């Protein structure tokens, strides 16, 4: 009996050490994942002020003869095309929900999609005549808040505006990034895995975001003929390169240097 008892004790000790090691590994993995999400949050906050945003006057020059809803449709179409391109490039990598060390491809997708959607949100606020008050830093914080909450900013309610990149905004951003990383890709059919899935999911999510923001902005929309003269938006010192389409061209007016549909004369920057 003694040898058997000793063997049982050794087996129990081994199981205990294995369980302890597993728990420790899970904790270390969780800590690394949280650190990766925190880094992504800071990265998005860092690039947000560099996103080029067209003001209402520029958009009206670029889309002559179109009304607010028609221009908004154009902006959404361009953003959807841009995020689909980002998703198609790294669709397979997005199948890793929360890896111990986040793949560079997945981090690039999240930040790329965020930049395109932040630009969309800012320009939709311009189109609907509800530019958030303040200088670039305050407006950028407001757009980040709108993106993380997937809602429009009500400029008549100061409580909906974040005047600085505080802890509350960072926490909401982390939650939003986590949701994007953990979205329902793992539950899709195996034969759908890959670039097509990344594009389809990003396309769907950007459309959903745009619909929610536009619904909010329509409630507080200011008609163009009732708008006060607004100053031109400040241009970022180091503009972030974004995909160019007829709807997302970052210029100050209509282009006249050739095709605008991605043809051979269109050599603008492309997202990876």
Question: Where are these predicted regions, by residue range?
Answer:
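Terminal, membrane-proximal amphipathic helices
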Residues: 1-86, 120-272
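Long, highly hydrophobic alpha-helical transmembrane signal-anchor segments
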Residues: 70-119
């Amino acid at each position: 009996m003694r040898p058997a008892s000793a063997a049982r004790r050794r087996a129990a000790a081994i199981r205990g050490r294995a369980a302890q090691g597993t728990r420790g590994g899970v904790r270390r993995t969780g800590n690394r994942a949280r650190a990766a999400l925190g880094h992504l949050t800071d990265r998005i906050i860092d690039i947000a002020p560099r996103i080029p945003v067209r003001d209402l006057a520029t958009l009206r020059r670029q889309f002559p003869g179109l009304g607010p809803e028609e221009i908004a449709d154009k902006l959404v179409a361009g953003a959807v095309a841009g995020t689909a391109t980002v998703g198609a490039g790294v669709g397979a990598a997005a199948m890793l929900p929360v890896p111990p060390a986040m793949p560079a491809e997945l981090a690039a997708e999240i930040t790329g999609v965020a930049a395109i959607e932040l630009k969309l949100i800012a320009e939709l606020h311009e189109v609907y005549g509800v530019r958030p008050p303040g200088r670039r830093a305050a407006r950028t914080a407001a757009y980040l808040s709108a993106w993380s909450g997937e809602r429009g900013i009500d400029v008549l309610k100061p409580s909906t505006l974040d005047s600085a990149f505080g802890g509350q905004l960072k926490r909401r951003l982390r939650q939003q990034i986590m949701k994007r990383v953990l979205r329902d890709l793992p539950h899709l059919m195996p034969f759908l895995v890959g670039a097509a899935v990344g594009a389809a999911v990003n396309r769907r999510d950007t459309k959903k975001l745009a619909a929610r923001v536009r619904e909010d902005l329509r409630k507080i929309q200011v008609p163009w003929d009732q708008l006060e003269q607004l100053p031109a938006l400040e241009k970022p010192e180091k503009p972030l390169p974004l995909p160019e389409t007829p709807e997302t061209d970052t210029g100050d007016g209509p282009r006249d240097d050739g095709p605008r549909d991605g043809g051979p004369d269109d050599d603008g920057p492309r997202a990876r």
